[in-house]
Amino acid sequence: MTVSSSIVPPGGLVLVTGVTGFIGSYIANGLLELGYRVRGTVRSSEKATWVTKALTKRNPSANFEAVIVPDQNAPGVWEAVLKDVDGIAHVAGDVSFGPDPTKVITPSVEALRRLLEAAKKEPSVKRFVFTSSDQAASNRSTTREILINEDTWNEEAIEAAWRPPPYEAERGWDVYSALKAQVEKEMWRFSREEKPSFVVNSVLPTYTIGAIFDEQQAGSTAKWLLDFYKDPSKDGFMRGFGSSYYVYVGDVALLHIGALTLEEVQNKRLLAFAGRFNFNSWLEVFRKHDPSKPWPEDDPTQALDTRRVNGETELYILKQFGKDGWTSFEDSALKVLESP
C-alpha cells in the first residue's frame, strides 16, 4: 500500500486516543512510519513527555503531537482536539476491571457518544475506528463451538454485568466484556441513525502480544507473559487464563491502519484472531528458546478455544501492507522478550 492511495491524504492527520497504551502506541508508530501526522491523547503531562520521546526516537522526522485530555466526558473536550483531523482511532478505554457497570460502562458509552458527536461536526473527518475486543463478540469457550462473525455479540456478558448489586469483584471480567460490546454497539447505532459523513469500522483484538513499546508502559497482556518468562514459578495467572486466540500487536496496528485508510474497508468488524493457544503453547515456545529455565510440566487439563472465525478481510488488509498472513505464534511470543 502507498500513502497516495489512502482515504487519509499523504501527510494527513490521525487522532489516536489512548496513545500511551500497548496497542495505541503501535498504531501511532505505524502511522508515523507511513508518513501520516499523529495527534495522540494522554491523561497527563508526564505521559505526554515519555510517549513523545518514544515515538520521535523511532521516527525522528515524524510529526507527532500529544494532547492532554484528563477527562473524556468533560463538556466540549473534543472540539479543539479534532480540528483538521482526517481519521480517528479510538483506542482509549477503561481497563480497571471494576465490577460496577454504572461506573465503568455508562461513562464509557457517554465518552464515545461525545467523541462521535464532535467528529460529526468536524468536516475533515473521513474515518472512525474503534478498538473493541474479542470479548465484545463472545466469551472464550473450550466446550461450545461458536462461529464469530460481524453479527455476534456477547449478550451473555452484558446480562451478567448488569445483574443487580452487590457488585462483587468477580464480576469485573463480565463488566469489561460488556463494556466493549456496549460501546461498540453504540458506535454502530450512531453510524446507522445519525448518518455521519465518515465511515466507521471496529477492530476486535484477542490476546495481544509483542514487545512492550516503552518501559513506561504497563504492558497489558504482553507484561503478563513477560513476567511468566522471567520467573516460570509464577505461572498461576497464565495457567489460569488458559486458552484463547492470540494476535501480534503489530498486526493489530495494521488492521487499524487499514480500517482508517483503505477505501474498500467500510462498516467492518475486523476480527483479530490469529490462532489458538493454551498454557502448554507458551511452554513449548519458551522451552525451545531457553531450555535451561525450570519450566513447569505441560498441563493435561488445558483444552483449546473452540470459537471459529472467517478472517478473509483481515488477511486482505495485512496483504496490502506486504504481509502474507498473521505473524506466527512463536514469533509473536518471542517478540515479547524484546521488551525494554
Swiss-Prot record:
Its EC number is 1.1.1.-. Gene3D superfamilies: NAD(P)-binding Rossmann-like Domain. Glycans are attached at N139. Induction: Expression is under the control of the terrein cluster-specific transcription factor terR. It is an enzyme of class 1 (oxidoreductase). The chain crosses the membrane at residues 7-27. Disruption phenotype: Reduces, but does not abolish, the production of terrein. The keyword Glycoprotein applies. It is found in: Membrane. InterPro entries: Epimerase_deHydtase, NAD(P)-bd_dom_sf, NAD(P)_dehydrat-like. One of its GO terms (molecular function) is oxidoreductase activity, acting on the CH-OH group of donors, NAD or NADP as acceptor. GO terms for cellular component: membrane. NADP(+) binds at Y176. It is a single-pass membrane protein. Keywords: Glycoprotein, Membrane, Oxidoreductase, Transmembrane, Transmembrane helix. NAD-dependent epimerase/dehydratase; part of the gene cluster that mediates the biosynthesis of terrein, a fungal metabolite with ecological, antimicrobial, antiproliferative, and antioxidative activities. The first step in the pathway is performed by the polyketide synthase terA that produces 4-hydroxy-6-methylpyranon (4-HMP), orsellinic acid (OA), and 2,3-dehydro-6-hydroxymellein (2,3-dehydro-6-HM) by condensing acetyl-CoA with two, three, or four malonyl-CoA units, respectively. 4-HMP and OA are not pathway intermediates, but are rather shunt or side products. Belongs to the NAD(P)-dependent epimerase/dehydratase family. Dihydroflavonol-4-reductase subfamily. This is NAD-dependent epimerase/dehydratase terH. It comes from Aspergillus terreus (strain NIH 2624 / FGSC A1156). The gene is terH.
